[in-house]
């Protein structure tokens, strides 16, 4: 019995030992749960306060709504049952993976330590975090509003500065235009008529009352008009100078022709230099001047007039860049006439060296040049102002030469191979046969194609 008693006394002890041994993994797992990273996360003030707020809201919702509370309690009971069953079945697996779980827990705790260092607000309650976030957002919005206000003030100052600068530039430009391109008589008359009206300010006051774009548009239009008038005046001066040179040269050529014929001078009016030669030709012996001296002076006068005319025509050619080709052709014709005259007197040492035919051709060239100058100015006056404003007012128009057309190819395309049906006919018979074949069956001939419109600088003005 004693032995059985010992066995009975030892059996419970052994069973207790086995139970304690079976409970040891559970105790170690409890210690692991105490050091679990999840517990640390839940213990954070921010998370704890948030969970408390959510729990209180959940409980109050269950109390206010009985049906919702019953459903929630049923769900809680189901979740607890499922969790208990899952833990009972997962206990062997957790015991088997205890070393790995400990390693993962250690790494997670280290990461949580670093996260707490970088995010101090995790140690603060949720209401404090929300308050600080509101303050931060309010400060950011206030800063953005201040920045927008400063930007608006800066843009206003920039706009005023730009307006003042543009007013200054426009004022200087208007003064320069008034100084270098003064108003014409027609514009002065218009201003005088406007000044007679009631309550009309000065030109400066009217300009100050106008807007920037209005002033800029009026300045550009006025500058274009004044530039047109200025350029037209220069062309008129060049035209008058060229015509004066041509008139003097014509009188000189007439003098040379009379001197070659031995005729007496006519008492008509002549230019000053030519008048002197006309006066010295008849009484040359009385004044002690020989016939050869007068001839040399006449040739010298002809060369000087030709040189001056060449310079005037060169200046006129420099002013016609950008003009229509017809106007440039007139100036080129004048240049050719002057070059021919210069070649006529280049090698002459006396009046006998100038051939009468060359002299007659020279007079004809001078007459043609005089007519070309008149036609040139008429072409300029009929042309639009803008196309021929060159230099600082508009870019120079450069005409591109078109490639030459192969006439043989065009003839082959138009004529084509002869029709073998009409090979035995002469040309008039072939023409009549072709007209009869190409005629309309109704008895009306086909309308010939219209010619291509003439190319102009401004097609919209062609009617």
Curated annotation (Swiss-Prot):
Its main location: other. Disruption phenotype: No visible phenotype. Mice lack detectable lipid droplets in heart. The triacylglycerol and fatty acid content in heart is lower. Keywords: Cytoplasm, Lipid droplet, Lipid metabolism, Mitochondrion, Phosphoprotein. One of its GO terms (cellular component) is mitochondrion. Residues 1-32, 433-463 are annotated as: Disordered. Residues 17-26 have a biased composition (Polar residues). Residues 200-463 are annotated as: Interaction with PNPLA2 and ABHD5. Residues 1-188 are annotated as: Essential for lipid droplet targeting. InterPro entries: Perilipin. Phosphorylated by PKA. Phosphorylated on serine in skeletal muscle at rest or with lipolytic stimulation. Residues 1-123 are annotated as: Interaction with LIPE. Highly expressed in oxidative tissues, including heart, liver, brown adipose tissue (BAT) and slow-twitch fibers of skeletal muscle. Lower expression in epididymal white adipose tissue and anterior tibialis and quadriceps. Expressed in adrenal glands. Isoform 2 has the highest expression in heart. The modification Phosphoserine is found at residues 17, 163, 337. GO terms for biological process: lipid droplet organization; lipid metabolic process; lipid storage; mitochondrion localization; negative regulation of fatty acid beta-oxidation; negative regulation of lipase activity; negative regulation of lipid catabolic process; negative regulation of peroxisome proliferator activated receptor signaling pathway. Pfam families: Perilipin (PF03036). It is found in: Lipid droplet; Cytoplasm; Mitochondrion. One of its GO terms (molecular function) is lipase binding. It comes from the Eukaryota. Induction: Up-regulated by fasting, PPARD, PPARA and PLIN4. Increased in muscle of high-fat diet fed mice. Induced by unsaturated long chain fatty acid in muscle. Residues 444-463 are annotated as: Necessary for mitochondria recruitment at the lipid droplet surface. Lipid droplet-associated protein that maintains the balance between lipogenesis and lipolysis and also regulates fatty acid oxidation in oxidative tissues. Recruits mitochondria to the surface of lipid droplets and is involved in lipid droplet homeostasis by regulating both the storage of fatty acids in the form of triglycerides and the release of fatty acids for mitochondrial fatty acid oxidation. In lipid droplet triacylglycerol hydrolysis, plays a role as a scaffolding protein for three major key lipolytic players: ABHD5, PNPLA2 and LIPE. Homooligomer. Interacts with PNPLA2; prevents interaction of PNPLA2 with ABHD5. Interacts with ABHD5; targets ABHD5 to lipid droplets and promotes interaction of ABHD5 with PNPLA2. Interacts with LIPE. Belongs to the perilipin family. This is Perilipin-5. It comes from Mus musculus.
